Design a protein with these regions (language model features):
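Bacterial N-terminal signal peptides that target proteins for export
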Residues: 1-7
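Solvent-exposed, acidic/flexible segments
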Residues: 46-57, 92-100, 136, 170-177
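N-terminal segment of the mature soluble domain
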Residues: 58-59, 63-137, 148, 186, ...
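Outer membrane pore-forming secretion/assembly proteins and partners of Gram-negative envelopes
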Residues: 133, 138-156, 161-164, 172-174, ...
């Protein structure tokens, strides 16, 4: 009798172990578009995020256009805005092009001809096309033919830096960011314009940036 009870209990345990667990296979949360200029209520950390990129570039655009030495010239100056001399020396992981691309594109739109933008980051593309025209591989196009490519008057330089503090007791991480922007006179090596954007964030559970 005892053996039969033991065998029955063992069989029940085996069947229970082989049974399919109660998994929640319901659909997850639907994708929702967020305003890029606001902080997410679900995913947010102490790094540089979309709302920071929007805020800093909007501020720099207003400041540049309000600077007579840059945007108030009789002959629109030529400027280069890319990430070549824009360094990330911070502990935050970010694609620098997110900042410089938005700054260049939105400034170009807002300047309305007061600034001329030199696409040095597309220099290889232009060189190949110019070579094809001059070798007779293609015709000269319909716009113009010049001996040299456009030289620039100013170029963007700057850096992202940060200062971190971590509380072992509470697990809170604090990060202060300082982002500098400068337009350099490419003939005299002087700084024609400077802008600074800074912010500080605290969080207990940081997020992973990719």
């Amino acid at each position: 009798m005892t053996f039969k009870l033991f065998a029955g209990a063992l069989a029940a345990l085996i069947l229970a172990g082989c049974a399919t667990p109660n998994l929640d296979n319901s659909a997850g949360r639907a994708v929702v578009y967020q305003d890029v200029s606001t902080t997410s209520k679900r995913v947010a950390g102490v790094g540089v995020e979309s709302q920071d990129v929007v805020s800093m570039t909007d501020r720099m655009i207003r400041d540049i256009l309000a600077t007579p030495q840059i945007a108030g010239r009789a002959t629109p100056p030529r400027i280069i805005i890319d990430s070549e001399y824009f360094a990330n020396d911070s502990s935050s992981r970010i694609n620098k092009n997110l900042i410089t691309d938005r700054l260049r594109i939105e400034l170009n739109r807002a300047a309305q001809g007061r600034l001329v933008f030199v696409a040095r980051h597309y220099g290889d593309m232009v060189s190949k096309e110019r070579e094809a025209k001059r070798n007779g591989e293609t015709d000269k196009g319909t716009v113009r033919a010049t001996k040299a490519k456009a030289g620039a008057d100013f170029r963007l330089g700057g850096r992202i830096t940060s200062l971190d503090a971590n509380s072992a007791a509470s697990g809170t991480l604090s990060r202060y960011h300082q982002i500098s922007f400068e337009l350099i006179d490419l003939e005299y090596e002087t700084i024609a314009w400077s802008g600074l954007f800074e912010f500080k964030k605290e969080a207990q559970d940081d997020v992973l940036y990719r």
